[in-house]
A protein has these predicted regions:
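Predominantly five- to eight-bladed beta-propeller fold
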Residues: 3-52, 62-120
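Extracytoplasmic beta-rich repeat domains
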Residues: 24-34, 123-143
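Blade-terminus and WD-like Trp-Asp/Gly-His loop motifs, strongest in beta-propeller folds
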Residues: 45-46, 50-59, 131, 140-141, ...
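Catalytic cores of secreted or luminal carbohydrate-active enzymes
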Residues: 61-64, 147, 162
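Short glycine/acidic-enriched loop and turn motifs that connect beta-strands
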Residues: 67-70, 162-166
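A short catalytic or substrate-binding loop motif that flags glycine-/basic-rich loops and adjacent residues
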Residues: 96-98, 140, 163-164
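A detector of repeated loop/turn-to-beta-strand junctions in beta-rich toroidal repeat architectures
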Residues: 101, 167-169
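Segments forming glycine/polar-rich beta-alpha architectures that bind adenosine-containing cofactors
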Residues: 107, 117-119, 153, 159-160, ...
Length: 173
């Protein structure tokens, strides 16, 4: 009971960090596994994002995926449902000309500014941010916070990988 009362007393001050949201050009983690019906029901709900915090919490990095030109894939869920349900999502297949493009942004909380990293090297590359390992109790309801690998907010370690997976660069920004 005390914990519930404490949660209700917490004041949350939300700050909108971006104003450039667009369907299929997202900061959110992919929501594969949801049927189209469920996706429509949950349209206004918040989605998990790919955010990596600096250990000093002064900055965070986000990965944004641009799938506006990617083609859709359809999956029919027919096993556990009385009637088949459709799941539609963007998926890059071998040979596709238009595939997901990725960006890394660094958000500075003190200045409320966003630095878009110039990371382009390989055509249709994949990217990722190196993060530290975190222990998490399976029954914990605490939000998961991914922390980037560097000791402070002055450096960010990331990788870029060619689409054919033959080349990988380890980078620092």
């Amino acid at each position: 009971k005390k914990a519930e009362d404490a949660i209700e007393k917490v004041t949350v001050n939300e700050i909108q960090l971006t104003r450039d949201g667009e369907e299929n050009y997202s900061y959110a983690v992919f929501d594969r596994g949801d049927t189209d019906d469920k996706r429509k029901r949950d349209k206004g709900k918040r989605k998990r994002t790919r955010i990596y915090w600096a250990k000093d919490s002064k900055k965070f990095a986000s990965i944004r995926s641009d799938q506006r030109k990617s083609k859709e894939l359809w999956v029919v869920h027919s096993v556990k449902n009385k009637r088949p349900k459709l799941e539609t999502y963007k998926y890059d297949m071998a040979g596709d000309k238009n595939v997901t493009q990725y960006e890394i942004d660094i958000h500075d909380l003190a200045t409320q500014s966003i630095l878009k990293l110039d990371i382009k090297k390989f055509k249709d590359q994949r990217i990722g941010v190196y993060s530290g390992r975190q222990f998490r109790y399976p029954d914990s309801d605490k939000p998961q916070q991914t922390v980037w690998l560097a000791e402070d907010s002055k450096k960010l370690y990331f990788y870029r990988q060619s689409r054919d997976m033959h080349k990988v660069d380890v980078c620092v920004a």
